[in-house]
Amino acid sequence: MYGRTLAGLRTDSSLESNVIPMRAIQVLIILICFLCNMLDGMDVLIISYTAPAIAKAWSISPANLGIVFSSGLVGMTVGAIFLAPLADRFGRKPLMILAALIMGTCIYLTSYATDVNILMIYRFISGLGIGTMMASTAAITAEYAPASTRDFWVSTVVAGYPVGAVLTGISSAKIIAENGWEHLFELAGLATFLVIPILFFFLKESDEFKAKAKPEDAKISALFTPEFKWSTWQLWSALFLSFTTLYFLMNWIPKLASNAGLSMELAIYSGTIFNLGAIVGIPVQGYFSTRFGLKKSIGILLLITAVLLGIFGQFSGSNLILVVLFFLGFGVQGSFVGLYAVAARMYPTAIRSTGIGWAIGMGRLGGILGPILGGVLVGLGLGMAESFLFFALPSLIAGIITLKISSQTIS
């Protein structure tokens, strides 16, 4: 049954929204998905920006802080694997509304957390919504975007993630200094609630989804048919390793910078510069992907990232550190977002959210590991240079694996 469905998905172009020029509805959907990913970036990175203040207020050890970081990532993993695939059956729209409701509620309630255990619970539950949202936005963007520029638009939509992170970083230093870290969570929760009516009134399922969705076998076994099996393993491995490095950097840069002697405000801005690099790197990667191919552009970016991580220590004590952080954000986030585009291109409509959700979920396992390893390294007394050198290896391996992904499955 699935083989016949897959054949139809590959050959039927009459329902593809991407065979005609961009229409107003396509632009609207892309903007909505970009906004949702901005909120994702805000909700994920807010714990990183508030970590120095929370750690100081509660006297949290580096190891426990790493567990707090990872609790949200565990939730994102569970959401991506078990909730996001439901969008292939019930639709992208209801899942995105549910995700926004979960995120907004738990982010707001985090402002009332009084100890580490409660903080971990709220981070886990909010992570369920974040993991669901990211997979759904990538899937619906792939269905609406024109075929010739699909990779660019998927990458651009996911670029909302670092945009939200940067805006949060820019505002958080002042908000925390004047009103405390709790107020930042309150504002983030309210901002997330505001997107719910936008999703309800303006988000539309694609014609492609409505015609081909709700198959009986939109399940994980569909990702391991002979056509997809090897490429699925390669994609999962590349995402796992990329997320390991990415989430170490996103969560620990402000704290490591603070440990290195920077003021709390400058430490927060160092994380902002990292995410600013992503804002530039993601659309540039999308452009290069349309020109030179997904595999080549992503793989090379990952290899460059590994080199930058390896030589970071050469810039210690120099103002060039901020420049290197910018290009690290450019490379690691540009490449990992490109892997979302690979997943969106690799799997057909009937299993697209399932494929993207599981790929993100496997990546999130690396995202869980990265901050925990960071906590161990910091607890051992390692500084930024030594920690960055350690994480050069997963970026190197991820780059090599990406270059080996079968071109046939993403053509």
Question: How would you label these PLM feature ranges?
Answer:
Residues Y122-A159:
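Cytoplasmic helix-loop-helix junction between adjacent transmembrane helices
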Residues S59, G91, Y112-I118, P146, ...:
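Helix-breaking motifs and short loop linkers at transmembrane-helix boundaries and internal kinks
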Residues S289-L339:
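C-terminal transmembrane helical hairpin of 12-TM major facilitator-type secondary transporters
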Residues V157-F201:
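Helix-loop-helix hairpin linking two adjacent transmembrane segments in secondary transporters
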Residues I47-S48, E227-I282:
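Extracytoplasmic gate region of multi-pass secondary transporters
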Residues L28-P62, L249-P254, G370:
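Extracytoplasmic
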Residues V78-V116:
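Conserved MFS/SLC helix-loop-helix module at the cytosolic interface between two early adjacent transmembrane helices
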Residues C106, N117-I125, N319-F327:
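Paired small-residue
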